[in-house]
Amino acid sequence: MTLKTIEGTFIAPKGKYALVVGRFNSFVVESLVSGAIDALVRHGVSESDITIIRAPGAFEIPLVTQKVAQRGEYAAIIALGAVIRGGTPHFEYVAGECTKGLAQVSMEYGVPVAFGVLTVDSIEQAIERSGTKAGNKGAEAALSALEMVSLLAQLEAK
């Protein structure tokens, strides 16, 4: 018996890509943005097909992402930001609501929303995940977006 497998690829399908970026912790977030753009361009997306939309912070990213998804102009949306744990429960609220909100937008509009919002315990962890020891999570989110666009196109064609 031969099993059929359907998988996405990283070859950029035609389309536009939106980066919704939270400005808080910009010293980390800008590395995520650079990583995402680099990954998209290396996989065939033209810079003219990439739009960066800046939100104040991670908590605001889901609403901005929803408005972008409503427009129907983008093949995928890549959410980028950084929430760093402090001494209050603020971290849990912001990280949780951002995560839930982005998942809701993706399901509601059928548009891939790649999650590149760091939720970390320390500045050191944020730096590691934005281009040093642990790779660049912005680039990883961009690759996830490309793969999802490809996968959904295959599923819709069947």
From Swiss-Prot:
Record-linked SUPFAM superfamilies: Lumazine synthase
Gene3D superfamilies reported in the protein's UniProt record: Lumazine/riboflavin synthase
EC numbers on record: 2.5.1.78
Catalytic activity: (2S)-2-hydroxy-3-oxobutyl phosphate + 5-amino-6-(D-ribitylamino)uracil = 6,7-dimethyl-8-(1-D-ribityl)lumazine + phosphate + 2 H2O + H(+)
Keywords: Riboflavin biosynthesis, Transferase
InterPro entries reported in the protein's UniProt record: LS, LS/RS, LS/RS_sf
Subunit composition and interactions: Forms an icosahedral capsid composed of 60 subunits, arranged as a dodecamer of pentamers.
Stated name of the protein: 6,7-dimethyl-8-ribityllumazine synthase
Originating species: Ectopseudomonas mendocina (strain ymp)
Upper lineage: Bacteria, Pseudomonadati, Pseudomonadota, Gammaproteobacteria, Pseudomonadales
Record gene name: ribH
